[in-house]
Amino acid sequence: MDSTELNRVFQMFDKDGDGKITTKELNESFKNLGIIIPEDELTQIIQKIDVNGDGCVDIEEFGELYKTIMVEDEDEVGEEDMKEAFNVFDRNGDGFITVDELKAVLSSLGLKQGKTLEECRKMIMQVDVDGDGRVNYMEFRQMMKKGRFFSSLS
């Protein structure tokens, strides 16, 4: 992931745009994704990432976290984590991410990208290997391993 993509992902979490991700912002972002994490666990996550000790995560700390995750993913992708991420997008549980489901998740995250069905259709087309107009788990997994999801948000 290049610095532009990293900034884009960081901004998804940095809701107020002050250059720092707080526990509250992290909590809100996860809730928007349908992931509930107790506040004490979120605090622990931030403490592990927070190198400068200010209680927040800045872009450099976020970048280091991302590098760590990507190195671990290259060695051994956590299948459970990958399925959990897929299920966030596959809202009806049918095993496919549709244009409508992608739009709903991106909207819930408050992203500028994917506001129209046409934008979401283009994003799906970028990773839809079998051409059925939806993303199955294997296509999603390949996309995530290659880091293509965040580049498709450009």
Swiss-Prot record:
Residues annotated as binding Ca(2+) 4: 128, 130, 132, 134, 139
CDD domains recorded: EFh
Assigned GO CC terms: cytoplasm; nucleus
Residues annotated for Ca(2+) 3 binding in this entry: 90, 92, 94, 101
EF-hand domain residues: 1-36, 37-72, 77-112, 115-150
Gene3D superfamilies the record matches: EF-hand
Binding residue positions for Ca(2+) 2: 50, 52, 54, 56, 61
Record keyword Calcium present: yes
Binding site for Ca(2+) 1: 14, 16, 18, 20, 25
Alphabetical list of SMART domains matching this protein: EFh
Pfam families: EF-hand_7 (PF13499)
Alphabetical keyword list: Calcium, Metal-binding, Repeat
MF GO annotations: calcium ion binding
InterPro entries for this protein: EF-hand-dom_pair, EF_Hand_1_Ca_BS, EF_hand_dom, EF_hand_pair_protein_CML-like
Function in brief: Potential calcium sensor.
Family: Belongs to the calmodulin family.
Protein's name in the database: Calmodulin-like protein 6
The organism of origin for this protein: Arabidopsis thaliana
Taxonomic lineage: Eukaryota, Viridiplantae, Streptophyta, Embryophyta, Tracheophyta
